[in-house]
């Protein structure tokens, strides 16, 4: 099954990655390491690099208490923080929460150490606006490793190509999110101090480094792998794919072609067999009366986005809209 015809693909050869539905040609971004690095890039490389180095101590600091702490924080910060709060609630407004609960989950997300809510939401909205083009903050056509991690260390690229936080005005209007943006580093230190106080160095290694690095790469695999390897179920006009393995790692985020087809949907695992842990949590919150205005795709929208509504024209599938 080929991808829809679009301006981007007219520039790309139709070679496919192994075990992938996605035709794409890399245009590897030449990252200039010898350059003037701004404070954001320096902070990112110190934080990400430092946490990876700390992980080397994991075998020597193992304890069951540290292990279970790591697993618990990974699940809580990943599901309630990154995927439920940052992604589906704040970025896409897929459902509504009482303000106190929205703020609480956003603070939980802060401790996944993937950035403050304003930065995360702004970057992800630019990703959807410019998906798989040269303006995409972590475009796969700039090379696998750029889309996976190196984009984090080139904030000038995002500023020049996309802009700053103009697309996150709904968050910037709220003093709470401006506060988290200004004080993000403080919360990183606070987390480290509390973990050390309660469990010493092993809690730092397992409760902060191991579970955070695991969370980093799980999220980054959505950016890199899920725009290269997997299956396309919907005519999204981009390179997004569904990848069941990444979905298992990320509480449902790996159903990425579904997500790009229905960005507003709180449910990413559209089919009954597509496990989506984050969606189950949202449904529980809805049952408890805490989540309202929960959005899911209509049957009409599904038919519109289906490849069955396309007319096959040689190598391309053109929307009949």
Curated annotation (Swiss-Prot):
It catalyses: (11Z,14Z)-eicosadienoyl-CoA + AH2 + O2 = (5Z,11Z,14Z)-eicosatrienoyl-CoA + A + 2 H2O; (11Z,14Z,17Z)-eicosatrienoyl-CoA + AH2 + O2 = (5Z,11Z,14Z,17Z)-eicosatetraenoyl-CoA + A + 2 H2O. Fe cation 2 binds at residues 127, 227, 256, 260. It is a multi-pass membrane protein. A motif (Histidine box-1) lies at residues 87-92. Expected to bind 2 Fe(2+) ions per subunit. InterPro entries: Acyl-CoA_DS, FA_desaturase_dom. One of its GO terms (cellular component) is endoplasmic reticulum membrane. The keyword Transmembrane helix applies. The histidine box domains are involved in binding the catalytic metal ions. This is Acyl-CoA 5-desaturase AL21.
């Amino acid at each position: 099954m080929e991808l829809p015809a679009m301006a981007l693909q007219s520039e790309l050869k139709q070679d496919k990655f192994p075990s992938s539905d996605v035709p794409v040609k890399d245009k590897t971004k030449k990252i200039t390491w010898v350059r003037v690095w701004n404070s954001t890039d320096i902070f990112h490389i110190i934080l990400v690099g430092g946490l990876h180095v700390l992980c080397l101590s994991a075998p020597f600091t193992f304890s069951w208490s540290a292990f279970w702490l790591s697993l618990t924080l990974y699940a809580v910060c990943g599901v309630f923080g990154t995927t439920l709060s940052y992604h589906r609630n704040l970025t896409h407004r897929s459902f509504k929460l009482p303000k106190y609960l929205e703020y609480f989950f956003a603070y939980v997300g802060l401790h996944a150490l993937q950035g403050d809510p304003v930065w995360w939401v702004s970057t992800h909205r630019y990703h959807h606006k410019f998906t798989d083009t040269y303006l995409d903050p972590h475009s796969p056509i700039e090379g696998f490793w750029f889309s996976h991690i190196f984009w984090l260390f080139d904030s000038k690229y995002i500023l020049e190509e996309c802009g700053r936080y103009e697309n996150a005005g709904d968050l910037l209007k709220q003093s709470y999110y401006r506060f988290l943006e200004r004080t993000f580093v403080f919360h990183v230190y606070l987390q480290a101090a509390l973990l050390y106080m309660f469990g010493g160095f092993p809690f730092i290694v397992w409760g902060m480094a191991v579970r955070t690095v695991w969370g980093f790469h799980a999220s980054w695999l959505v950016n890199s792998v899920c725009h290269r390897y997997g299956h396309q179920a919907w005519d999204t006009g981009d390179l997004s794919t569904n990848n069941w393995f990444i979905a298992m790692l990320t509480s449902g985020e790996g159903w990425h072609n579904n997500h790009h087809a229905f960005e507003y949907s709180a449910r990413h695992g559209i089919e009954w067999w597509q496990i989506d842990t984050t969606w189950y949590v949202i449904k529980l919150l809805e049952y408890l009366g805490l989540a309202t205005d929960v959005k899911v795709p209509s049957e009409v929208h599904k038919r519109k986005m289906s490849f069955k509504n396309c007319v096959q024209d040689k190598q391309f599938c053109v929307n009949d809209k």
